[in-house]
Amino acid sequence: MSEAIIAKKAEQVELIAEKMKAAASIVVVDSRGLTVEQDTNLRRSLRESDVEFKVIKNSILTRAAEKAGLEDLKELFVGPSAVAFSNEDVIAPAKVISDFAKDAEALEIKGGSVDGKFTSVEEINALAKLPNKEGMLSMLLSVLQAPVRNVAYAVKAVAEKDEEVA
């Protein structure tokens, strides 16, 4: 190989390794067998969720995983591999891909990483069932509001009782 090609591949490895280090979650899939329309729809759904999706050569993924300290991911880089990266939302790639895989049988989830820790297919599917960040925040807010609401109802009941007595 020429030095220019080697330099370009080294640059790719460095770029992918940085994405892996920065990612809150990574999902590796085999998208072989998807129609062009399905692939386009998957990419659109991922883009709408701020998830980056790339098909990358396994040799580059393997070197990038080593460089990023994610050696456990190397076992996933067999056969065609596409990778979804999310820097913000841990759940987004798992949710979008898992939901899409229900309709597109050709899409196979291989595994991934959440906060730098290896994640199995089962864990990714479990993660996909969780509500998104906004859903979790609204659940937390309702839990925090419940005691305040109960106190308000109690104060109102006492005030109404005092009015009846007076």
UniProtKB/Swiss-Prot annotation:
<dbReference type="InterPro" id="IPR001790">
    <property type="entry name" value="Ribosomal_uL10"/>
</dbReference>
<comment type="similarity">
    <text>Belongs to the universal ribosomal protein uL10 family.</text>
</comment>
<dbReference type="GO" id="GO:0015934">
    <property type="term" value="C:large ribosomal subunit"/>
</dbReference>
<keyword id="KW-0694">RNA-binding</keyword>
<dbReference type="Pfam" id="PF00466">
    <property type="entry name" value="Ribosomal_L10"/>
</dbReference>
<keyword id="KW-0699">rRNA-binding</keyword>
<dbReference type="InterPro" id="IPR022973">
    <property type="entry name" value="Ribosomal_uL10_bac"/>
</dbReference>
<keyword id="KW-0689">Ribosomal protein</keyword>
<dbReference type="InterPro" id="IPR002363">
    <property type="entry name" value="Ribosomal_uL10_CS_bac"/>
</dbReference>
<dbReference type="GO" id="GO:0006412">
    <property type="term" value="P:translation"/>
</dbReference>
<comment type="subunit">
    <text>Part of the ribosomal stalk of the 50S ribosomal subunit. The N-terminus interacts with L11 and the large rRNA to form the base of the stalk. The C-terminus forms an elongated spine to which L12 dimers bind in a sequential fashion forming a multimeric L10(L12)X complex.</text>
</comment>
<dbReference type="GO" id="GO:0003735">
    <property type="term" value="F:structural constituent of ribosome"/>
</dbReference>
<comment type="function">
    <text>Forms part of the ribosomal stalk, playing a central role in the interaction of the ribosome with GTP-bound translation factors.</text>
</comment>
<dbReference type="GO" id="GO:0070180">
    <property type="term" value="F:large ribosomal subunit rRNA binding"/>
</dbReference>
<dbReference type="InterPro" id="IPR043141">
    <property type="entry name" value="Ribosomal_uL10-like_sf"/>
</dbReference>
<keyword id="KW-0687">Ribonucleoprotein</keyword>
<dbReference type="InterPro" id="IPR047865">
    <property type="entry name" value="Ribosomal_uL10_bac_type"/>
</dbReference>
<protein>
    <recommendedName>
        <fullName>Large ribosomal subunit protein uL10</fullName>
    </recommendedName>
</protein>
